[in-house]
Amino acid sequence: MATKHEQILTYIDSLPVGEKISVRRIAKEMKVSEGTAYRAIKEAENKGFVSTIERVGTIRIEQKKKENIEKLTYAEVVNVIDGQVLGGRAGLHKTLNKFVIGAMELDAMMRYTAAGNLLIVGNRINAHRQALEAGAAVLVTGGFNTDDSIVQLADELELPILSTSYDTFTVAAMINRAIYDQLIKKEIVLVEDILTPADRTVYLSPKDKLEKWYEKNFETGHGRFPVVDDQMKIHGILTSKDIAGHDRNASIEKVMTKNPVTVIGKTSVASAAQMMVWEGIEVLPVTDGHQKLIGMISRQDVLKALQMIQKQPQVGEKLDDIVSRGFKDEGDDKEDQTVYEYEVTPQMTNQLGTISYGVFTTILTQAANRFLRSKKRGELVIESITIFFLKPVQMESVIEVKPRILEAGRKFGKMEVEVHSQGHIVSKAMLMVQLMERS
């Protein structure tokens, strides 16, 4: 039996796109307390089912597919620009294809404006009307308003007409930044991108006998199976270690590992990797946040995803990407120690003209990561780092980074990284890392 919380989420999901939602209405229709309704609406917002807009309320929106994440809805634009909705509220859930800045004569402006666009313009009433008639939404900058006839037309066509106090350039920059941030989010590989879905996952029931494990093991060749009830709620996990020494007629419920470590679909692959190393487990059940099984991931899935992340072309550039671009592999020095060369650019410095601590830490960790991969030791997750800053590093100076493995086990390792500039040692770091060896 689904909980009240899950029933409300299912109800919200079934509502048509553009429908207005309120705590009081949900509580009344679902016969629950307002607190329960509020919590469910908040979770729906986190999942992308609904969006809350100031002075408008909460509306049901279309959940974006990951491949279309670079496109924004008008509802998101309102939040990005701190704007207000003058008319056309029913169209806030629609997606904008591109935005057009109306800094030209009206006839020329309309040549660039098409359905699904957002026209950014000042207090030009004729431009507002023609844009709406062309199927485009309108964003009025400078805090200006529009005519009542335009608001009425926007309501009829279900095309939003928005207003913001910012100027045109600032608004365009803010929307551009929002799209760019979403492109970066697109690159972050999540567990939901690599999981084996529940309908393709082999699972057992707590009521089954251990004999069932042997049957599934023979059929699939796998040795680890999630244990779920009729509602797909996860109760445990059964592995070959659990069944050792037990009779085949014993109940799975008595033998299985209860309360297994689980992740949700929105967990990053990097977090899942760290969890698997720390707990020493080979598979992780993936749930919907309420212990309902939606799939499984294995250590092999995670390693493959981490390798894919390193090879894929970057769309939105992150700070780590900018730093890693400057590395040059200088081979080995006289003592057969691997050396990486790096030039400090002006963007990497602080107000004193020396290298920023954040950038410096990134250089050290990336050098350690590159070195481990070159030694075929797999991926690393840093547990702790101690840095000794001995001398300041000036802008445009070239530094030599020398990583070295002090000790490496199957799961953990210790590393030392020395940094030299102009023949002098400028920094030394000690790293404790978790290792995830390639199988």
From Swiss-Prot:
CDD domains membership: CBS_pair_DRTGG_assoc, hot_dog
Annotated ranges, domain CBS: 195-254, 256-314
Phylogenetic placement of the source organism: Bacteria, Bacillati, Bacillota, Bacilli, Bacillales
Parts forming coiled coils: none
Entry keyword set: CBS domain, Repeat
SMART domains, per database record: CBS
Keyword Repeat: yes
Organism: Bacillus subtilis (strain 168)
Pfam family, one: DRTGG
Name of the protein described by the UniProt record: Uncharacterized protein YtoI
SUPFAM superfamilies tied to this protein: CBS-domain pair, HprK N-terminal domain-like, Thioesterase/thiol ester dehydrase-isomerase, Winged helix' DNA-binding domain
Transmembrane segments: none
